[in-house]
Amino acid sequence: QRVLDALNRIGGCGLENLKITGATEQDGYRNKVQYPVQEQNGRAEAGFFSAGTHRVIPIAHCRIQPDCADAIRAAVLRWMAQYKIRAYDEKTGRGYIRHIYIRRGAVSGETLVCISANCKQLPRSAELTAAIRAAAPDVTSIVFTPNEKKGNTILGDTFLPLYGPGWIQDTLCGLTFRLSPAAFYQVNHDQAEILYRKALQFAALTGTETVLDLYCGTGTITLCLAREAGRAVGVEVVPQAIEDAKENAKRNGLAD
């Protein structure tokens, strides 16, 4: 209903109803999860913010997250407890660990873990890497992002690999994509494929057009369009996403 209201109010479409294409997977479909970390009663907890607040509600499991997420989250919290590494306190600006970020390739099965922390060098990083790999052997990249900004910003501006290349790859609509921590990628892989194919159908490209893809992220839509248009141009403000997009164009033989 919100989408319908927005289309009518903002787009002036005059629609009475929308046909919904339902998702085939209701559980475990989300390929990315971000847990804020917070000190509660003398121990670090990770979960999700309570609605309208910055108070973390600890969780044991979330049905829509990747299967590996629980083990990774628990491993990080155990590491924090073992080495007395404090969670970041948004009010005082003290403490270290801010967020646990996990991204998993739906097709590739590759998994990236990114730790956001309020420091330039992550203490006990070797022990953290060992703990995560022991808990989730399919993790292929572990990254530390220094984030000393005030507030609750999730990621910093730089990404330092602790293990692996610092990115994962996945396949979408027959194309292979490199995915870095800061780059946008649709969180529901299967529905993204349905969405992209429907967009291509509506575009009805003949092979002569120049297509502009604004806020292109890693270039997923841009490259899907490039196969059917005369020329496709992606525009993005996130530097890491652009680097991924250029690499993805090369990987798929679609670079100019």
Question: Where are the regions a protein language model picked out?
Answer:
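SAM-dependent transferase fold signal centered on methyltransferase-like domains
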Residues: Q1-L160, Q201-T208
